[in-house]
Regions:
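Pair of pore-lining "gating" transmembrane helices in MFS-fold secondary transporters
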Residues: 1-16, 94
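Residue-level signature of mid-helix packing/kink "hotspots" within the transmembrane helices
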Residues: 43-51, 135-136
Length: 188
C-alpha cells in the first residue's frame, strides 16, 4: 500500500504540473518560449536522471530513495511557488524532475522485489491502476483547488500531499531490496 499511494501521489504531481505550471508561468509574465522551456525542464530532468536512479536503488535500497524522492518533489513544487522568475522556476522544475526520477523506477523495482513471478503481472497491474489514477486525481484536485483558492494554493496542497506521502513511505514501508549474503573471502 505504501508503494501504491506513493505512485498515485507521484503522478498526482504530473497532473498538477501539466495543468497548472504553464498557467502559473504565464501569470508570472513568462513568454511562450520561456513557458515551453520551463515545461520541458521537469520531464527532461526526470527522463535523464532515472537512467541513474534505477540502478542506484539496486545499490542503496528502495525505501529511503522513494521517501527522499517524494520530499525532493515537494521541495521542487515549493521552489516553483516561491520563485519570482525564470531561474527559480527552472530550479524548481529540475528538483521536481530529480525527485520524480528517484521515485519512478524505484517504485516498479519495489514491486518486482516482492512479487513472485507467478503473480507479478497482476501486482504490477494493481500498482499501475493506482499510479495512473494519480494523473486524473492530480488534475481534478489541482483544478478545483486552483479555481477555489488560486494557483499557488493548489500547488501548495500538492506539495503538502507529496511531502506526507514521503512520510507514509518512511513510516510504513519496509525495505524490499534483498541483498545477497556476504560470501567469505578465501584465505581470510
Amino acid at each position: 500500500s505504501s508503494v501504491s499511494q506513493a505512485g498515485l501521489v507521484n503522478n498526482l504531481n504530473d497532473g498538477m504540473a501539466w495543468g497548472l505550471f504553464p498557467l502559473f508561468f504565464v501569470a508570472a509574465r513568462m513568454n511562450l518560449e520561456q513557458v515551453g522551456t520551463l515545461a520541458a525542464i521537469y520531464p527532461a530532468t526526470w527522463g535523464v536522471m532515472q537512467l541513474f536512479t534505477g540502478a542506484w536503488s539496486d545499490r542503496v535500497g528502495r525505501k529511503w530513495l522513494i521517501a527522499a524522492g517524494m520530499w525532493v518533489q515537494a521541495a521542487g513544487i515549493g521552489v516553483v511557488v516561491l520563485a519570482d522568475g525564470f531561474a527559480g522556476f527552472a530550479t524548481g522544475g529540475a528538483l521536481l524532475g530529480v525527485g520524480t526520477a528517484m521515485v519512478y523506477p524505484t517504485l516498479l523495482a519495489a514491486i518486482g522485489d516482492v512479487a513472485h513471478p507467478s503473480w507479478r503481472a497482476s501486482s504490477v497491474g494493481v500498482y499501475r491502476l493506482w499510479r495512473d489514477l494519480g494523473y486524473a486525481v492530480g488534475a481534478l484536485l489541482a483544478g478545483v483547488t486552483a479555481d477555489a483558492f488560486g494557483l499557488p494554493a493548489a500547488m501548495w496542497v500538492v506539495a503538502a500531499l507529496t511531502f506526507v506521502s514521503g512520510l507514509v513511505v518512511a513510516l510504513r514501508m519496509t525495505e524490499t531490496l534483498r541483498r545477497a549474503p556476504e560470501t567469505a573471502v578465501e584465505g581470510a
